[in-house]
From Swiss-Prot:
Pfam families: IGPS. One of its GO terms (biological process) is L-tryptophan biosynthetic process. One of its GO terms (molecular function) is indole-3-glycerol-phosphate synthase activity. The gene is trpC. This is Indole-3-glycerol phosphate synthase. Belongs to the TrpC family. Keywords: Amino-acid biosynthesis, Aromatic amino acid biosynthesis, Decarboxylase, Lyase, Tryptophan biosynthesis. It is an enzyme of class 4 (lyase). It catalyses: 1-(2-carboxyphenylamino)-1-deoxy-D-ribulose 5-phosphate + H(+) = (1S,2R)-1-C-(indol-3-yl)glycerol 3-phosphate + CO2 + H2O. Its EC number is 4.1.1.48. The keyword Protein biosynthesis does not apply. It comes from Aeropyrum pernix (strain ATCC 700893 / DSM 11879 / JCM 9820 / NBRC 100138 / K1). The keyword Cytoplasm does not apply. InterPro entries: Aldolase_TIM, Indole-3-glycerol_P_synth, Indole-3-glycerol_P_synth_dom, Indole-3-GlycerolPSynthase_CS, RibuloseP-bd_barrel.
């Protein structure tokens, strides 16, 4: 059977980890990193919802997305974003851990990769990341617990990405205190089902404790879709491709979000 994209990405991440161990041993987590969850809550209080703007130059589903440089991206998104999600995966997403420090000057940074080891979390902390993405489907329950605990030791918050409400509830149980994401993209096939994501966000919001921050991820490429995600129960949305490809669309979405009642 042909390996899924997720299986390939996990294998690649494990190979890269061995190359990162020496770097991790020689670095210290940066002090004074801002809190991702606090920034999201502040935006929810101020305007009713938060945007995590993702810097993503390419992807396995879309190929090359944009050549927009980090300076231009920050200038375009800084005033209306609660945080940045920075792709650090190099092979499919054209990412790098070296991007983190620049974005961390302005907002809390979510380091986004297929994280399978404590080494990756430590390096993210050393580079200035406030939070790290843990993909539930890429980890066993024990691995998720161990990596969440490692993140806590380094002062790194965790966003656990899940495919549906039942996994979201389980993730919150396994990694208490984590931010929970529901992704509309199937990581095995790379297909996006935005409507299914809305249903799962709504179910997750009903089942999760009120203090758990819920994030809607992927497939949000218009103001209407953004607002529907908030109405379904997400406190934050993560938007990548739409912000990278289309400056006009980016401005429309951000302007609309600033008017959330």
């Amino acid at each position: 059977m042909r390996d899924s994209f997720l299986q390939k990405a996990i294998a690649s991440a494990k190979d890269r980890t061995s190359l990162l161990e020496e770097i991790a041993g020689n670095c210290s987590p940066k002090p004074g990193r801002p809190s991702l969850s606090s920034s999201i809550r502040e935006w929810v209080y101020r305007v009713g919802g938060a945007v995590i703007a993702e810097y993503k130059r390419c992807s396995p589903s879309a190929g090359a997305i944009s050549t927009l440089d980090p300076v231009s991206y920050v200038q375009a998104t800084r005033d209306a974003s609660a945080a940045y999600s920075v792709l650090t995966e190099p092979n499919w997403f054209c990412g790098s851990i070296e991007l983190i420090p620049y974005f961390a000057r302005y907002k809390p940074v979510l380091a986004k990769d297929f994280i399978v080891s404590e080494t990756q979390i430590r390096i993210a902390a050393c580079m200035g990341a406030s939070a790290a993405l843990l993909i539930m489907e890429a980890l066993t329950p024990r691995e998720l617990q161990e990596l969440a605990a490692a993140a806590s030791r380094y002062g790194v918050e965790v966003l656990v990405e899940t495919p549906d409400a039942s996994h979201a509830v389980e993730a919150s149980r396994l990694a208490p205190g984590s931010i929970i994401g529901v992704n509309s993209r199937d990581l095995k096939t790379l297909r996006v089902d935005y409507e299914a994501m809305l249903r799962e966000v709504s179910k997750a919001r009903e089942q999760l404790p009120g203090e758990v921050i819920l994030v809607a991820e992927s497939g949000i490429d218009s103001p209407d879709k953004a607002l529907k995600a908030f109405k379904a129960g997400a406190q934050a949305i993560l938007v990548g491709t739409a912000f990278m490809k289309n400056p006009q669309l980016r401005e429309k979405i951000l302007a609309e979000l600033l008017q959330i009642p």
